A protein has these predicted regions:
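Secretory targeting and sorting signals
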Residues: 2-56
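Charged, often glycine-rich, active-site loop that binds/positions anionic groups
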Residues: 120-150, 305-322
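Structural recognition of the beta-strand scaffold that forms the well-ordered cores
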Residues: 61-73, 115-120, 164-169, 174-176, ...
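Oxyanion-hole/transition-state-stabilizing segment in secreted/luminal serine hydrolases
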Residues: 73-77, 128-211, 243-246, 341
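Mobile gating loops/cap/lid regions near enzyme active sites that modulate substrate access
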Residues: 246-277, 284-347
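Short amphipathic alpha-helices and their capping/turn segments at secondary-structure boundaries
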Residues: 53-64, 148-167, 221-235, 362
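Serine-esterase "nucleophile elbow" of acetyl-processing enzymes
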Residues: 56-123, 185-192
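Conserved N-terminal glycine/acidic-rich loop preference
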Residues: 165-168, 192-227, 237, 241-280, ...
Length: 372
């Protein structure tokens, strides 16, 4: 196994209290219990499938599923490279956490190595993991007719009884968190209704935040059930979202596009406490119910949000620093980050943010493989 630096070992050790094993549900929710029981027979049937070997004799099989917070988007080099015929519009990159973790898991334990199949895709929803074909929307050198649809990630990853570990980072797009940020940005630039008011008492045709979270919970239950059915012998690890918003909305510089732009301070506080934290809690609650492992990357990233200065932030703001191939304008909107010599980053982790997530996910995978 490749030697690790003292700093790397310390970083891994510091995650011990942040990665919780699966277990009983801390806050029982009747609907969650009813839905999970509904899929229980299917999972029980999966358990009766004869167990195969842990994988090929010389390797463990790890599948990484998820959205842009897993794929990377603008962090590092595109993977596959620009110009490669196999590019699929999913914006996976070399410095996103799956690739970072893969490099750290070379020959672990001695005599075996971890083989990564990364099928994460920008803009993926929970449904895109398990059920539906996704049409990628990468703005980077799209083909003339647009990107062709890709199969559900469970299918793309070819999950089976030889899969040892599955990591999943998804949920934000099903909640439509990115769209909520843009709506909050729009409402913040004009007097009138706040973002909180808009989503707690929404207009006709718009879901309330309460309904959004309930729907995400139901979708997550169904998705995890299908992952277990597809990979009955795998250790399943879910990954939450980092602290992209500050602990105090007033910490943000209003109108600074490198932070959260025109979003009102009170709405930032609402987005943090009533949207982002409940989303993570929902993911953790469902994960615990299935007996899987949840990786918390929120706590360790507090103080490194989008409103921190460069060098401290682990999340870029509405506009931010990104690789040269990434666009400075957001198609279909008036957002133009070129005016401040930045690129459109829409509150996504930078390389430091992915490195933090990688340390936590790496430790969770090591534990999972030792228990396999």
């Amino acid at each position: 196994m490749r030697p690790m630096s003292v700093g790397r070992l310390a970083a891994l050790a510091s995650t011990a209290l942040l990665v919780r094993p699966g277990g009983s549900m801390r806050h029982p929710v009747s609907r969650l219990r009813m839905r999970a029981l509904a899929v229980g027979l299917a999972l029980a049937a999966s358990a009766l499938v004869p167990s195969g070997s842990a994988g090929a004799a010389d390797q463990y099989e790890w599948a990484a599923l998820g959205d842009s917070y897993t794929a990377g988007g603008f962090v590092g080099d595109p993977q596959p490279p620009l110009g490669d015929a196999s590019r699929d519009g999913c914006d996976r990159t070399t410095h996103a956490y799956p690739g970072v973790v893969e490099g750290e898991l070379e020959e672990f334990p001695p005599g075996k190595y971890v083989h990564l199949t990364n099928v994460s895709c920008g803009n993926a929803t929970i449904a895109d993991i398990a059920d539906t074909k996704q049409t990628p929307i990468s703005p980077v050198q799209p083909p003339a007719g647009g990107w062709p649809a890709v199969d559900p990630q469970i299918q793309r990853a070819k999950l089976n009884d030889q899969t040892d570990v599955v990591t999943i980072g998804v949920g934000g797009n099903s909640l439509r968190f990115g769209g909520m940020l843009l709506k909050c940005l729009e409402l913040g630039a004009t007097p009138g209704k706040s973002c909180r008011e808009y989503y707690t008492s929404p207009p006709e045709g718009e879901e309330s935040i309460k309904d959004k979270l309930a729907r995400v919970q139901d979708e997550y239950i169904g998705m995890l059930a299908k992952v277990h059915q597809a990979a009955p012998n795998a250790k399943v690890i879910t990954v939450g979202y980092p602290a992209v918003l500050p602990e105090e909305g007033s910490a943000c510089n209003r109108l600074a596009l490198t932070e959260l732009g025109a979003i009102k301070h009170a709405d930032i506080d609402w987005l943090r406490d009533d949207v982002l934290k409940p989303l993570n809690s929902t993911i953790q609650r469902v994960t615990d119910f299935f007996g899987d492992r949840y990786v918390d990357v929120y706590f360790s990233s507090v103080g490194h949000d989008a409103c921190q200065p460069a060098g401290t932030k682990w999340v870029e703001g509405i506009c931010g620093d990104a690789a040269g191939y990434w666009p400075a304008k957001l198609p279909g909107t008036l957002l133009n980050c070129a005016v401040i010599h930045k690129r459109v980053t829409l509150v996504h982790p930078n390389a430091e943010g992915h490195a933090n997530t990688a340390a936590h996910v790496e430790r969770a995978i090591r534990i999972a493989l030792l228990q396999h």
